[in-house]
Amino acid sequence: VVETPRRSMNKLINSNDSVKRTIDEAFMIRAIKMHLAPAVKEEHLAEIVKNATLEKFDANQELFKEGDQGDSLYLIRSGSVTVSKSIGEKNTTLAYLPAGNYVGEMALMTDMPRSATVKAAVSTETIVLKGEDFRGLLSKNPDTRHQLELLIAQRLEQNKEKKSGHGEGLV
């Protein structure tokens, strides 16, 4: 293990695009493995990460809007987001999600429009996985797919409770 001061490391990362991309890819693999697909081997994740991008959002900027067609999954690298939904005439905040969480998987797995609007609560950076790469990951990893299907079923039930006014569900 080599310890490098943060300032020196940031200077190195920003000095060369290929160094920055290599370090970003290593981070993306680790983040996806830790938060989204723990059972998937790193070499399989490396293929997906080649197409992944990092996207920054300012506070209050939308990642996506309720009703949009889903084309990507967003893993929150830094910052946080709010998840809200139109219920009747009112816009209701369903959840506040900090770094390490992900959004957008429901639309990708169900082929339905986005079920909620997601906005950056503060300056936020995300790892963006394209829908086709995410679906490819799930098709090769049925255990990961099953875990996400269970989570989606739970979120849909919580959304239904929230919409009827009987719950404090999270999305």
Model feature map: region roles:
Residues 1-171:
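Cytosolic regulatory regions built on CNB/CRP/Popeye-like sensor folds
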